[in-house]
């Protein structure tokens, strides 16, 4: 049984494309780990059933444990990707609140406005 990595192809920012590749590589790693676990358990059963043409038999408990672990890891990776994408998108905007020179109250805000033909403009 092979894990089919399902990744929605969204339009990603240039910063989060690296995260997309990290997620893809981690899914490949999880897939190889699940295949090696599957191989170990089925290899153990193969020794006992060597005389009969049974094939590779995997207990259902092992499959359930593997799928629960894979589902948990996929959810954790999805959460990490969402949070890091949000973090990098906030950083990419380069917001510096100290450079805004916000006034202390409305009175100083009204004093700093000047009238133009298009409306009021803040004076720096």
Swiss-Prot record:
Transmembrane parts of this sequence: 70-90
Compartments (UniProt record): Membrane
GO CC, alphabetical: membrane
Keyword Transmembrane helix annotated: yes
Main localization of the protein described in the UniProt heading: membrane
Keywords: Membrane, Transmembrane, Transmembrane helix
Protein topology in the membrane: Single-pass membrane protein
Additional comment: Partially overlaps LSB1.
Protein name: Putative uncharacterized protein YGR137W
């Amino acid at each position: 049984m092979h894990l089919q990595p399902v990744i929605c192809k969204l339009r990603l920012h240039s910063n989060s494309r690296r995260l997309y590749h990290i997620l893809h590589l981690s899914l490949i790693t999880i897939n190889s780990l699940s295949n090696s676990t599957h191989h170990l358990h089925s290899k153990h059963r193969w020794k006992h059933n060597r005389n009969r043409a049974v094939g590779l038999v995997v207990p259902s408990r092992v499959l359930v444990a593997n799928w629960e672990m894979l589902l948990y890891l996929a959810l954790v990776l999805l959460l990490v990707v969402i949070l890091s994408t949000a973090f990098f998108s906030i950083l990419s905007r380069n917001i510096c609140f100290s450079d805004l020179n916000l006034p202390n109250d409305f009175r100083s805000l009204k004093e700093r406005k000047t009238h133009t033909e298009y409306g009021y403009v803040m004076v720096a």
